[in-house]
Amino acid sequence: MSKNLTRTPSVSARRQEAERRRQEVRRRLMIAGAVVLALLVIAIAAFVLTQDDEPEAGTEITGDRPLAAVDPAVRNNYYSEPPAMTIDTDKEYEAVIRMADGGEMRLSLFDDEAPITVNNFVFLANQGFYDGTTFHRVLENFMAQGGDPAGTGSGGPGYTFEDELDTGFNFDRRGLLAMANAGANTNGSQFFITFTETPHLDGLHTIFGELTEGDDVLNALTLRDPDTATEPGDVIDEIVIVEK
């Protein structure tokens, strides 16, 4: 009588099959890991590129701007003392100078290096003090000066405050924002933006910002010497502060 015999794999064959399966699993895991890593790299690259193309816009500070409706000449000597410190030096500030003709200049403010000056500028801008004033003094290859409610170069907010000269900045390039003054520690509301390097001003005027956008608008400002001009300077519609 015959018997049906079932052959079973040898121990060696079973081990080889198990090893083959383990290697197949490892291979699939490695492929899956590589795919995930590649997708992660692509996602990070896309995020970085998006951040570069679309920088944080920040928030425009809006409020009543109580002086915006007051004739600029009436604002002359409107205040009796400098403003209290209200800016947050842990944040970043920008100023957007919007011209009446539609042009716009954007400036980064150096609140870490010149907090008192930036605080003053932010306060006046938010009050509407600069709305409707002009760039009353614009000299070729030198600077464009504004911020005077009288429009003559002699006006101001009614107070003065000290210089901040130890900021680490020098007048070594175009587009620097600085305070105009009548001597040491006589800052008020008037400011200027340089057209070129002006090293002879080093140590005399507080630098508190720099132009980041709108160089063409700066370049297009009408040249004007207040001592001889018969027409008013280019009008500033408003200066808006952006907080980041």
Locate predicted features.
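Cyclophilin-like peptidyl-prolyl cis-trans isomerases
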Residues: 1-244
